[in-house]
């Protein structure tokens, strides 16, 4: 079973990218579990046809210790298994701690057991690696390969670089490696070339360039992934390509994060800062 975590700055499209990629893998016959590690609990909605499923933490709060696996995992598109860790009530407690509680419970209840024949587990993780709880999939070896969703915007690249620092910190202890950058295009000038160069300097690859297409939002409004909503649309092929590249990926590295002045010089070089 391959253990994958998707990171990236808030609002970059991690949950959308994760679910569309998982749809591509599921369509190709892979057994995938998605663990949403975001208090917004929107990491599985499109795979479940719009169902806002009850989170692990909400279930624990209501049921106490009497939680069964079927209470917290729902079956989604083409047999994908979906769960949301959820978070504390706003303004109370630590969301990172909630992820740790949720993943531990999933392990205790046998969500990762051989009987499920899982090929992949995907962790869709909130924002930047800023607190230990959100770094947990990296830190405790829950995830072995990381993909960072970014774009040619400065803050997205800055966040990607920060996440690389987190991977570097835990690479020896947890055995985690960077699998590549996924460029979720924002139609910035020279975006593809810039992210390819950023990847090269960090020591990784841009595994796929996902072009911007409003059809993604149209599918979302209809509560589906692109592949589910219209399998013949060109954007569906983009996500299939990304799924295939992740499935075939052999490049796993310990990244070399850039200093801030190196990052800024990259932005200047490609004209974004002019």
From Swiss-Prot:
Q: Which PROSITE patterns match?
A: NIFH_FRXC_1, NIFH_FRXC_2, NIFH_FRXC_3
The protein's role, per its UniProt record: The key enzymatic reactions in nitrogen fixation are catalyzed by the nitrogenase complex, which has 2 components: the iron protein and the molybdenum-iron protein.
Question: Native species of this protein?
Answer: Chlorobaculum parvum (strain DSM 263 / NCIMB 8327) (Chlorobium vibrioforme subsp. thiosulfatophilum)
Q: Which reaction(s) are listed as its catalytic activity?
A: N2 + 8 reduced [2Fe-2S]-[ferredoxin] + 16 ATP + 16 H2O = H2 + 8 oxidized [2Fe-2S]-[ferredoxin] + 2 NH4(+) + 16 ADP + 16 phosphate + 6 H(+)
What NCBIfam families does the entry give? nifH
**Self-association and partners:** Homodimer.
Q: What's one GO BP annotation on this UniProt entry?
A: nitrogen fixation
Return the protein name: Nitrogenase iron protein
Q: What is its EC number?
A: 1.18.6.1
**Residues reported in the UniProt entry to bind [4Fe-4S] cluster:** 94, 131
Record's PANTHER family?
LIGHT-INDEPENDENT PROTOCHLOROPHYLLIDE REDUCTASE IRON-SULFUR ATP-BINDING PROTEIN (PTHR42864:SF2)
Q: Which GO terms describe its molecular function?
A: 4 iron, 4 sulfur cluster binding; ATP binding; metal ion binding; nitrogenase activity
* Keywords of this entry: 4Fe-4S, ADP-ribosylation, ATP-binding, Iron, Iron-sulfur, Metal-binding, Nitrogen fixation, Nucleotide-binding, Oxidoreductase
PTM note says: The reversible ADP-ribosylation of Arg-97 inactivates the nitrogenase reductase and regulates nitrogenase activity.
* Organismal lineage: Bacteria, Pseudomonadati, Chlorobiota, Chlorobiia, Chlorobiales
Which cofactors does it use? [4Fe-4S] cluster
What's this protein's family per the entry?
Belongs to the NifH/BchL/ChlL family.
Cofactor descriptive note:
Binds 1 [4Fe-4S] cluster per dimer.
Q: Which residues bind ATP?
A: 8-15
Which Pfam families has this protein been placed in?
Fer4_NifH (PF00142)
Carrying ADP-ribosylarginine, the residues are: 97
Keyword Metal-binding among record annotations: yes
UniProt keyword Nucleotide-binding present: yes
């Amino acid at each position: 079973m391959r253990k994958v975590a998707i990171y990236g700055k808030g609002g970059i499209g991690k949950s959308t990218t994760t679910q569309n990629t998982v749809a591509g893998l599921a369509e190709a016959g892979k057994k995938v579990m998605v663990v949403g590690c975001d208090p917004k609990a929107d990491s599985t909605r499109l795979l479940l046809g719009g169902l806002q499923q009850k989170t692990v933490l909400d279930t624990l709060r209501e049921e106490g210790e009497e939680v069964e696996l079927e209470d917290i995992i729902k079956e989604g598109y083409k047999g994908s298994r979906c769960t949301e860790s959820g978070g504390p009530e706003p303004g109370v407690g630590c969301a990172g701690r909630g992820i740790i509680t949720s993943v531990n419970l999933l392990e205790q209840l046998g969500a990762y057991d051989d009987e499920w024949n899982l090929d992949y587990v995907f962790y869709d993780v909130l924002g930047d690696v800023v607190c230990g709880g959100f770094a947990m999939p990296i830190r405790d070896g829950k995830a072995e390969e990381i993909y960072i969703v970014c774009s040619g915007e400065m803050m997205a690249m800055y966040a990607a670089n920060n996440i690389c620092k987190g991977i570097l910190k835990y690479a020896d202890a947890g055995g985690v490696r960077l699998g590549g950058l996924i460029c979720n295009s924002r139609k910035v000038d020279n975006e593809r070339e810039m992210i390819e160069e950023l990847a090269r300097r960090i020591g990784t690859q841009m595994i796929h360039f996902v072009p911007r297409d409003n059809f993604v939002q149209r599918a979302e409004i209809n509560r589906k992934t692109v592949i589910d909503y219209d399998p013949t649309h060109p954007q569906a092929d983009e996500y299939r390509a990304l799924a295939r590249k992740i499935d075939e990926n052999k490049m796993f590295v310990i990244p070399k994060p850039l200093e801030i002045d190196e990052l800024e010089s990259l932005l200047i070089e490609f004209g974004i800062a002019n």
